[in-house]
């Protein structure tokens, strides 16, 4: 049993840790306040090869494992959860089905430019009445000559206001099963609606997307067969949960570092507050929780890399890491007391942003049902 990182993994972690410290963290607050998509940093990460880490060299990627990707993504999240959410979408959900199922034209014209940061992708799955309940997805794709006509409403679509193309889940065929389509932003019948004002991740734009008689040619049906979308989605969900856990680790580490630093500098009753047992116990709990969460996330990623069963472990990792991170961010705000409530300190941003990880990829309540089903089978 070896818990050490390989030399390559350590080099990847160090590269993105430096980038986070030198490029992301200094801009994070300003980007957050401006509610501005971090396009320049997005492109810089593309130049570092971030978007191609998980894809094979044959299509312009670097063929790295999920474990390496999680190390890098966690460092990005440590600097900015908004940026981490954007690059996670670009690296997996927004592009995976193009690479996996798209034809040569789609790969050359959209997928490869996306790896370079020249195109931005998003996934359209959630609907006003279909969140955790995928069976309630109501968007339809009706067969016509030469393709399909899509009608429906999607919401909570990450990166939609800046996206160039969308991977859309809609019901098609006689049995109305989920089918995957590619829709480009400029085609008639697609409307990117109002931007949703959120509690956190202010620099990550999220909006509604409407499809009203939107024609999609046969060549843009990504599904090999009508109705195979749910199967592809289930295979991807475990990865989504693991990388969401990795993002939670990043913001938790940032919050713990802020709390430790403040507790060492802040003096009350003639000594630093980290000399008081109440603060020491809180810091100990935060550090222990983070260590345990890190182990769960990286083991789940390793199981995925080894192509071993990992759906239960992915759900456990996401559940524990995100809930633990939320607690760490809350405790950090308590350590800073009034300053944890002040906008000039980053802890308030960590506390707002961490909730993003509690929702994406499945809520904690849904994950518990997944875990219970796995352990009971």
Curated annotation (Swiss-Prot):
Signal peptide: none annotated. The gene is iaaF. GO terms for molecular function: acyl-CoA dehydrogenase activity; flavin adenine dinucleotide binding. It catalyses: (2-aminobenzyl)malonyl-CoA + O2 + H(+) = (E)-2-aminocinnamoyl-CoA + H2O2 + CO2; benzylmalonyl-CoA + O2 + H(+) = (E)-cinnamoyl-CoA + H2O2 + CO2. PROSITE patterns: ACYL_COA_DH_1. This is Benzylmalonyl-CoA dehydrogenase. It comes from the Bacteria. Homotetramer. FAD binds at residues 123-132, 156-158, 266, 277, 363-365. It comes from Aromatoleum aromaticum (strain DSM 19018 / LMG 30748 / EbN1) (Azoarcus sp. (strain EbN1)). Belongs to the acyl-CoA dehydrogenase family. Transmembrane segments: none annotated. Involved in degradation of indoleacetate, the most common member of the auxin class of plant hormones. Catalyzes the irreversible oxidative decarboxylation of (2-aminobenzyl)malonyl-CoA to 2-aminocinnamoyl-CoA and CO(2). In vitro, shows high catalytic efficiency with benzylmalonyl-CoA, a chemical analog of the physiological substrate, but otherwise accepts only a few medium-chain alkylmalonyl-CoA compounds as alternative substrates with low activities. The expected physiological substrate of IaaF during indoleacetate degradation is (2-aminobenzyl)malonyl-CoA, which is not available for testing. However, the missing amino group in benzylmalonyl-CoA does not appear crucial for substrate recognition, since the compound is readily accepted by IaaF. InterPro entries: Acyl-CoA_DH_CS, Acyl-CoA_Oxase/DH_mid-dom, Acyl-CoA_Oxase/DH_mid-dom_sf, AcylCo_DH-like_C, AcylCo_DH/oxidase_C, AcylCoA_DH/ox_N, AcylCoA_DH/ox_N_sf, AcylCoA_DH/oxidase_NM_dom_sf. Keywords: FAD, Flavoprotein, Oxidoreductase. Its cofactor is FAD. It holds the Pfam family Acyl-CoA_dh_1. It is an enzyme of class 1 (oxidoreductase). Its EC number is 1.3.3.17.
